[in-house]
Amino acid sequence: MAGATMSRDTDRAAVYAAEDQWSAALNRGGVIDFFGSRLQLPVQTRFGSLPAVQQYVESLQAMYPDIPPVSARHRRGDTRAHYSNGVIAIPMAATWACRESVLLHEFAHHLNSGSCEGAQSSQPAHGPRFRVLMVALVGRAQTPESSLLLRSCFESKGLVVPAHVD
């Protein structure tokens, strides 16, 4: 779909807020009370070098062998991480950015980019398709419990997470 225009990304702030809640729980890991049930959460990995980030990205890539490759690079500044055209840019000097939750978020952008289907996506960058891909990715890369918590964090912010990708 050449020339597709990106839809307005109205859910970005709510997605970031939901992921901040989820990431804070992963910083601690361990057992949490989840509406009367006990969930065992992993402690999220923190990365100290670009080669470690790249190795993790490659482990995610191995879960999706039919999609185009993605690489990681250092990004100057410390205000945000970024995904564009098969490249995840991480400000390595910013400790907040060197976390597993950030890499999962940026890799989900790769899955949502449209390049995985050979076309440019016209979906909002943080819309329902992104969220369902992110939840599924977390279930594969981490645990079903972590995925359930992320889905609940999205829903607590009023964000729809579809049952599957259309």
Regions found by a protein language model. Give the residues of each.
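Metalloprotease/metallohydrolase-associated module, dominated by Zn2+-dependent proteases
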Residues: 4-98, 116-166
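Active-site recognition of the HExxH zinc-binding catalytic motif
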Residues: 101-114
